[in-house]
Amino acid sequence: ELEEGLTHTINYFSDIPLFLEVEASYSCNYFCPRCPRQVLGHEGRTGFLSDELFGILFQEVKKYRIPSINLSHGGESLLRKDLPELIRKSKDNGVLDIMIHTNGSLLNKQLSIDLIQSGLTKINFSLDAVSPQIYGKLRSEGNYEKVISNINDFIEVRNKIGRSYPRIRLSFVVCDENIHEQEAFYELWEDKVNVIAFQQFYDFSKGKDSDGVNSSNLGCVPY
């Protein structure tokens, strides 16, 4: 149903945006050393997109039949207590593909149920490690064991409910600190989630340089 709806939209409404990315939360509960928030000086940016702006957004989404939306960008999406409701409103206004990105630290079983039943179609967990030691280097505020437990609980809840959605994606941004864990990461998660994504580093501090990025000094960005 989702694939058919997206195909219909692409065929008949290709003159409108097919995808929107909305920063529902500007805030983040982590302070990751290589995150663009720190590199670009956005670490002090906090707050949430207002209900008023979301109301306008949903009107436009419905009017133009936007098929796909990501309710995350640079902040931590789960800091919004009303996130499941925003997902439901997206669905009620005709969005077919609704995704979020999260570090997973704020999940619990009830929130997992709420997200799964809200109409969410994709969730991405930014993990980047397979050990507490490496996770601690990349996620200075993070608790690896808690995050892993939260992700496993989410998988278990989705399977118990009997849903095939949301599709679960784990991202691993390859850098000097974690490259030796890449294979173990795949082996740990290959039978548990729908997608495992290995991504290359990008140093946002050098992104302003028109001469390009030095591939030997790349920085992590969660996807």
Give residue ranges: language-model regions.
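Radical SAM enzyme [4Fe-4S]-AdoMet core and its adjacent flexible, acidic
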Residues: 23, 44, 49-52, 56-59, ...
